[in-house]
Curated annotation (Swiss-Prot):
Belongs to the peptidase A8 family. PANTHER family: LIPOPROTEIN SIGNAL PEPTIDASE. Its main location: membrane. Keywords: Aspartyl protease, Cell inner membrane, Cell membrane, Hydrolase, Membrane, Protease, Transmembrane, Transmembrane helix. The gene is lspA. This is Lipoprotein signal peptidase. GO terms for molecular function: aspartic-type endopeptidase activity. It comes from Chlorobium chlorochromatii (strain CaD3). Its EC number is 3.4.23.36. One of its GO terms (cellular component) is plasma membrane. It is found in: Cell inner membrane. The chain crosses the membrane at residues 58-78, 84-104, 111-131, 132-152. GO terms for biological process: proteolysis. The keyword RNA-binding does not apply. The active site is at residues 113, 139.
Length: 163
């Protein structure tokens, strides 16, 4: 369990530190710093919604939802007897990412996003399309953890008939 909590704490710390740097160097001076021209940049954004910029509910409800998901992940891991790394790793990434974004919602009322891959910006017919959202380390951890759960479902949950 030390590994589970250590990794979750590391994700929270890395996420919060990176957001501090984004707030300090991107918010007021330059909204964007190009790393690889026309492909990768650090671009400051305030996300009041959830993944991919969706705003399905008021901020207080999103905060409550984040708290409930984080509590459910923690409860599930503590209740389980499985202590293998392949089991703990995805859940620690999801918990750490959830807590990192939850801190932002509690302190600022929005989540700081700053990582941007410019995969495609342009028109498809008459519709303008921006193919990739701006995200942060917490979002990355949640996505990686969720992907691991999907990829290793049979290994993680061998008794599940869906596996």
């Amino acid at each position: 369990m030390k590994l589970f909590f250590s990794l979750a704490l590391f994700v929270v710390a890395a996420d919060q530190f990176s957001k501090y740097v984004a707030l300090r160097f991107l918010r007021d001076a330059n909204q964007s710093i190009s790393i690889i021209p026309n492909f990768f940049s650090f671009t400051y954004a305030e996300n009041r919604g959830i993944a991919f910029g969706l705003e399905p509910a008021p901020p207080a409800l999103l905060l409550l939802f984040t708290m409930m998901i984080s509590a459910a992940v923690l409860w599930y891991v503590l209740r389980s007897n499985n202590r293998r790394l392949i089991f703990l790793l995805p859940f620690s990434l999801i918990l750490g990412g959830g807590v990192g974004n939850m801190i932002d919602r509690m302190v600022r009322g929005y989540v700081v996003d700053f990582i941007y891959f410019n995969l495609y910006n342009g028109y498809v017919g008459n519709i303008y399309l921006s193919l990739w959202p701006i995200f942060n380390i917490a979002d990355s951890a949640i996505t990686i953890g969720g992907t691991m759960l999907l990829l290793f479902h049979r290994t993680l949950f061998p008794d599940d008939p869906i596996a």
